[in-house]
Amino acid sequence: IHGTPGEDGKLQGYLDMLGIPYSTCGVTASALTMNKFICNNYIKNFGIKVAASICLNRASKYDIENIAKQLGFPMFVKPNTGGSSFATTKVKSINQLQDAIELSFKETQDVIIESIIEGIEVTCGCYKVKNKEVTLPLTEVVTTNEFFDYSAKYEGQVEEITPARIPEDVTER
């Protein structure tokens, strides 16, 4: 089940209460990873570099000029707890920022605004079987769109290259 309640820990918690096994990650991992801002702050504790970000909720008072000054352009504005790059905007100037924030607020109660990290986009699946962790090969994500947006993900405007074309030492990390 895509999104809430399938990816945010709610369904997993319900299944745990009923003693029904399932094949996704558990409640904690699901809840943590569905909230981008909290997840990014958590993984920073392990030395993982993440984009600088600001999280706003509907009650937040914010200053567009201050956000622009803090994060610079371009930046991404997206629902903090959404997925699929839905209502995500790559903002290139201060003139686009307010509209991008409002678009994301139409989908969720909180919005994350992130600086951009330039580079190669990769994804990696992993799973656990009988207490053994298995990591799949890295896949490089290449799109002709400006970023890996909803249409790239769901309308086939993407090329996925496995293994990713990155140095072996980077893959090992």
Spans of model-derived segments:
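Conserved N-proximal alpha/beta basic substrate-recognition cap immediately N-terminal to
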Residues: 1-54
